[in-house]
UniProtKB/Swiss-Prot annotation:
Extent of the transit peptide: 1-15
Protein's recorded name: Mitochondrial zinc maintenance protein 1, mitochondrial
GO biological process: mitochondrial respiratory chain complex III assembly
PANTHER family for this protein: COMPLEX III ASSEMBLY FACTOR LYRM7 (PTHR46749:SF1)
GO annotations of cellular component type: mitochondrial matrix
Subcellular location: Mitochondrion matrix
Species of origin: Eremothecium gossypii (strain ATCC 10895 / CBS 109.51 / FGSC 9923 / NRRL Y-1056)
Keywords: Chaperone, Mitochondrion, Transit peptide
Annotated family: Belongs to the complex I LYR family. MZM1 subfamily.
Record field: transmembrane: none
Domain of life: Eukaryota
Function: Assembly factor required for Rieske Fe-S protein RIP1 incorporation into the cytochrome b-c1 (CIII) complex. Functions as a chaperone, binding to this subunit within the mitochondrial matrix and stabilizing it prior to its translocation and insertion into the late CIII dimeric intermediate within the mitochondrial inner membrane. Modulates the mitochondrial matrix zinc pool.
Gene (name only): MZM1
Main localization of the protein described in the UniProt heading: mitochondrion
Length: 119
């Protein structure tokens, strides 16, 4: 497959991902597609074409799996309905229970109050 056809396939993949991610939110759908179109018409010359194609496919994957939109429920304060679709990646949050290894967590955080929090 030639480079131009792979670039076009990546662009179409990203356009389909915007439809999945933004659904009926026309304002965000149009803005995302406009940004992608601008990136295709004026690509970053500092990146090789192969990296640009990979980046576009990575964007499409991110939009499909990680982006969730919320819509405020009318008549209820601070209540939002999340639009989780079949391609949304749902994690089990198992890593939250693991002991932190950052310098801040070892020293107890910024104020020292969480010294024994993760033990």
């Amino acid at each position: 497959m030639s480079t131009s056809s792979r670039a076009l396939a990546a662009y179409r993949n990203a356009l389909r991902a915007t439809k999945v991610a933004f659904g009926e939110d026309v304002r965000m759908l149009v803005a995302a597609r406009k940004a992608m179109r601008h990136g295709m018409l004026a690509p970053d010359a500092s990146l090789p074409v192969e990296d640009q194609i990979t980046h576009m496919n990575d964007i499409a994957t991110f939009l499909r799996r990680n982006l969730v939109q919320g819509k405020k429920v009318s008549g209820k304060d601070d209540v939002y309905q999340l639009r989780i679709h079949e391609e949304t990646e749902l994690g089990d949050n198992a890593t939250i229970k693991e002991t932190k290894t950052t310098l801040a967590s070892q020293g107890g955080g910024c104020c020292g109050g969480g010294k024994d929090l993760y033990k």
